[in-house]
Design a protein with these regions (language model features):
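Short, basic/aromatic beta-hairpin or loop at an interaction surface
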Residues: 10
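Soluble catalytic domains of membrane acyltransferases
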Residues: 7, 16-126
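Helix-enriched interaction subdomains in cytosolic or periplasmic regions
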Residues: 1-6
C-alpha cells in the first residue's frame, strides 16, 4: 500500500526536519472509527496529519485533483477519495460512511480550500 510505504519512509525525515508539536496526542484515534476535522493552511496539511496520526487517515479531496490517471493512482494509493464540492455529493458521502463502518479514520478539511488568513471560512457543500 502506497500510504504505508510513504508513511514509513518519510516519517523519520519529517520528524527530523519539521519537528511537529502535537497537542492532546492522547485524543488521537488509536482504535475504533473517528473523524478528523481540520483547518487547511497549506498543501502539506494532509501529509503532516498523516505523519503524526497513529493510524491511516482516509482523506476526502476535491474532485479536480483526480483529473489525470497518474494523480488518481497516487491519491487513491494515499487513501484519498474524490468529492464534488459544488453540491451535495452522495457518492463521496457513502464513501466516508464506508470508511467509518470499517472502523477507520476519515479526514476532512470542511472549508474545501486553504485558508490564507488562518481564519475559519465557510464550508463547502460536498
Amino acid at each position: 500500500m502506497l500510504y504505508i510505504l510513504f508513511k514509513y519512509l518519510l516519517t523519520p525525515f519529517f520528524w527530523l526536519f519539521y519537528r511537529p508539536k502535537v497537542k492532546n496526542f492522547g485524543r488521537l484515534f488509536f482504535r475504533g472509527r473517528g473523524i478528523l476535522i481540520s483547518n487547511h493552511f497549506s498543501l502539506g496539511d494532509p501529509i503532516r496529519l498523516a505523519m503524526v496520526a497513529p493510524r491511516p487517515i482516509h482523506f476526502m479531496a476535491k474532485q479536480e485533483l483526480f483529473d489525470t490517471p497518474v494523480k488518481r493512482f497516487f491519491l487513491k494509493g494515499l487513501l484519498a477519495f474524490p468529492v464534488y464540492r459544488k453540491q451535495a455529493d452522495m457518492v463521496s458521502l457513502k464513501q466516508a460512511m464506508s470508511v467509518l463502518e470499517k472502523n477507520h479514520i476519515f479526514g476532512i478539511f470542511p472549508e474545501g480550500r486553504r485558508s490564507l488568513t488562518g481564519e475559519l471560512d465557510s464550508f463547502e457543500k460536498g
